A protein has these predicted regions:
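Acidic/histidine-rich catalytic neighborhood of metal-dependent amide-processing enzymes
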Residues: 118-193, 455
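Flexible glycine/proline-rich, aromatic-decorated loop/lid segments
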Residues: 189-205, 414-416
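Active-site metal-coordination/substrate-binding segment of hydrolases
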Residues: 78-145, 439
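An extended, acidic, His-containing surface patch that forms the Zn2+-binding/catalytic region
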Residues: 51, 184-185, 242-319, 330-343, ...
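Acidic, glycine-rich active-site loops and adjacent beta-strand->loop/helix elements
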Residues: 87-89, 111, 147-156, 178-182, ...
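N-terminal helical capping/dimerization or prosegment-like subdomains
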Residues: 2-95, 319, 336
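A generic structural motif
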Residues: 118, 208-210, 326-333, 363
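A short core secondary-structure module
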Residues: 217-238
Length: 455
């Protein structure tokens, strides 16, 4: 057993309890009533960073939730890694679908079950404990800075300004992020690309009050009916987006990419069974893995209006609402797409309702060059921990701040994540396997043993 494995084995119970201390804080950025929890979680992270060996760790205020900054400087001449993560989590609703309380972590069947077990408290803890392991074994070959934000799940609205203000403080050679997933438990991988994101809220208003559906139905437009028609028309029967100009900057999947994607082990039957669907759906001419990584998509994330309580109430509602998003591919500008969407809705909305579109958060896609020295270091580190050389894969999720880091700080990012699809992030019963938790720590420690990370 290597010294790294021995250190992890000797300290694994403490590592788990420290993670649990974070999970028990419901740091939900989407809900204002959890503002005190955001502050408490940030403070707890400073304590854990200092205990892990950071020279300093402080809570720094922003226009929104605070940022946690920490650092360990081994030498002015050494190269520097900036570790990014987030301490906020998604809301846990619907609670009735959880098999255990979301903020009371449990270990069952070799997994940690709780909100944030994977995204991203679990993966952030892998980073910090990997750093601690390398430091205590005298293996740390580079300076390490940490920046943990509290607004990733709401689009990082305060982080760009923070980065611009503290550009010198955040100076580094590469950014390391653990907030992505691997292909499967049997197939380790490194993420080489992410999709971008554009997100909107839509409000449709008809009459000035809820109306009796018998007295007014058929004579007055129903806002829910109108909203459903507007949203349904955004995609065709195959899921292709119909907004004019939407695909102008979309590059088709290249033959080389298609060949690389085809090498990824993928069992369609297992995929369908895991998510409980009989058939898959999507743009014609593309495989499932191409659709959910290299092609854009449109989704209604929430839609509501009218009477939703127990029993029946025959009303024609005054208002209807939706939250919708587009996943974008590299070269699609989220600002341009947002404008196209707003102009499209304004053009097709009927005169008998008022439609208001409010753009929310968004960001660009990102592609990591696989010839970066830091990528090679991550590849070797994962190989040591998992016993298999990781595949290079593009993923369908979004971390909009990654492209901002490159634009503002001028630093490339390496995405070394340890999640799995079955971990159910953003869903009830989120979890993380203990095996991956420890292998993630080992991978990070192995990464820090490799001094050549400068681009």
């Amino acid at each position: 057993m290597t010294s790294v494995k021995k250190y992890i084995e000797s300290n694994k119970d403490r590592f788990i309890e420290e993670l649990f201390s974070l999970i028990r804080i419901p740091s939900i950025s989407a809900k204002h009533e959890h503002k005190p929890d955001m502050e408490a979680c940030a403070k707890r992270w400073t304590e854990l960073l200092l205990a892990a060996g950071a020279d300093k760790a402080v809570v720094m205020q922003t226009e929104g939730n605070p940022v946690v900054y920490g650092e360990k400087m081994v030498s002015p001449e050494a190269q520097t890694v900036l570790v990014y993560s987030h301490y906020d989590v998604m809301p846990a609703e619907p609670f009735d679908l959880w098999k255990s309380r979301p903020f009371e972590p449990e270990i069952r069947d070799g997994r940690i079950w709780a909100r944030g077990a994977d995204d991203d408290k679990g993966q952030a803890m892998m980073q910090v404990k990997g750093f601690e392991t390398a430091l205590n074994l005298d293996l740390l070959k580079c300076n390490v800075k940490f920046i943990f934000e509290g607004e990733e799940e709401i689009g990082s609205p305060s982080l760009e300004a923070f980065c611009r203000t503290h550009k010198e403080l955040l100076k580094a050679d590469v950014i390391l992020v653990s907030d992505t997933s691997m292909v499967s438990a049997e197939t380790p991988s490194l993420t080489t690309g992410l999709r971008g994101l554009a997100y909107w809220e839509i409000e449709v208003t008809g009459p000035n009050r809820d109306l009796h559906s018998g007295h007014f139905g058929g004579a007055v437009a129903n806002p829910i009916n109108v909203l459903c028609k507007l949203m349904a028309d955004i995609t065709d029967a195959d899921g292709r987006i119909t907004i004019p100009g939407f695909y102008d900057d979309v590059e088709d999947v290249s033959p080389a990419e298609r060949e690389m994607i085809a090498q990824i082990p993928f069992d369609e039957a297992k995929y369908k069974a895991a998510i409980g669907v009989d058939e898959l759906f999507g743009e014609k001419g593309y495989s499932t893995l191409e659709r959910n990584s290299c092609r854009p998509s449109f989704d209604i994330c929430g839609i509501w209006g009218g009477y939703m309580e127990e029993g029946s109430k025959t009303v024609l509602p005054s208002k209807a609402y939706a939250k919708v998003s587009c996943r974008l591919v590299p070269h699609q500008d989220h600002g341009k797409i947002s404008k196209l969407f707003e102009e499209y809705i304004a053009r097709v909305a009927p005169a008998y309702v008022k439609v208001r579109v409010t753009p929310k958060h968004g960001g660009q896609g990102y592609v990591c060059p696989i010839d970066l020295p830091a990528y090679k270091a991550a590849e070797e580190a994962v190989f040591v921990a998992f016993g298999k050389r990781p595949l290079a894969v593009r993923r369908g999720g979004s971390i909009p701040i990654i492209s901002t880091f490159e634009q503002v700080l001028g630093i490339k990012t390496v995405l070394m994540g340890f999640g799995l699809e079955q971990n159910a992030i953003h869903s009830p019963n989120e979890s993380c396997t203990l095996d991956f938790f420890y292998k993630g720590i080992e991978s990070v420690a192995e990464f820090y043993k490799r001094p050549q990370i400068r681009n």
